[in-house]
């Protein structure tokens, strides 16, 4: 029937008010995105933001305390600290930094690899864009290439470091890197929007337990696990609802589960 409301329009009408509810500055203080928000220089924001996203699991109060400790160890100059990092000179600052399964050796090696990337490209933005094909529909190829090169920058990189840096080609949902890219690319009250060479239309949804509950309620994925195929499926559905900014719906999916609120049944 002409003028009939489509399923995507129904879902957008349900989800858009949830985005408006949760995508506010009030969200920032208790979220790891608050850490890069604490810096003014975009170079500092992208560097410390990478650590904040990569370590984003477990209790939030514990995570934020650990990230504040990391900032202090870097003398609150993450770009300078990482860019000029020397293991013999600076490794001691990270010698006892632990967050859950992330050990001091992981911190040293990750910082070593990021330092090499900054020395080669000047910024993590440039390092990422170097691996994102022109016209790519989503950021998947960029994530894969960026992580692959990062791990290859030093042939001595321990195998255990790889488990902290997921790749789509391994089937992983790459939740933390998808979240990092949302922070870097999307402008808004919560996200930083400092990477202008990547379009918000290319972003994918970070999938986790909280967001998956809402995604399943809305019938947006037929897959039972949070893998890269599920990421592509959900992101494509969100792209159909909002072609220029699919990742905005992360707030609608994550917010209710994280706060324990019940938004009511979807249409």
Give the location of each predicted region.
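HhH-family (HhH-GPD) DNA N-glycosylase catalytic core used in base-excision repair
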Residues: 1-267
